[in-house]
Amino acid sequence: MIPCSNRIQEILEWVNGNCIADIGCDHAYVVCNAILNHQSKKGYACDVAQGPLDNAKKTIEENHLSDFVSCRLLDGIQGLSDDVDQIIICGMGAKLIIDILSKGNLHSGLRFLLSSHKDDFALREYLHDHNIHIVREKMIYDHGHYYPILDCIVKDHIQNISFAQLHFGMNMKMDSTYLSYLDFEENKYKNILSKVNKPEFLEKIEYIKEIRTRRSEEHTSE
């Protein structure tokens, strides 16, 4: 396995497509490791700029993966090969991810791994409005920041999702990292409310309490 960040390792845990595409590939660590780990049979390292593709090509060649991984100069997912069944879009803001998704030719059954570094609510809202179901989520902590990873699939109908889930995750893995994230968010909003009275922040605290209550009820029923 090629050494990589904790964030990339967490993303790799949910890579399982036969043919994957890593959008904004940087050094192609995700797609190359997926091949080396026998999680995928082939893949594409994609970027809108030539520089990252040159870095990706170097990684591919150094690990003797030229028969399995190809580089593609693409604007998002436009022009992506039809054999791709899982697309990874991570390490960018939600607005850019949404822009990429909005320009793609999405079909039922196509799967995504998504991870934004800000505006999580906007991303989940877009997915909900466009029949992209969130199968599961997990929260990771890397270099002082929390990042959600969303495992998604395109469907032909809308997914039921609450406001609490839009804000703080759908089918989220309830581990210590996520619980620490909830504590961090709650303290942040309480600190804001101590200085200015804004109902929307009180509402978010209530959503966090709702999630904790649901988790407690699930543990009781086990």
Language-model-derived ranges and their functions:
Residues 27-39:
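Conserved SAM-binding loop of SAM-dependent methyltransferases across substrates and taxa
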Residues 1-18, 32-33, 54-82:
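S-adenosyl-L-methionine
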Residues 102-151:
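C-terminal substrate-binding/active-site "lid" region of AdoMet-derived donor-dependent transferases
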Residues 49-51:
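Conserved SAM/SAH-binding beta-strand->alpha-helix loop
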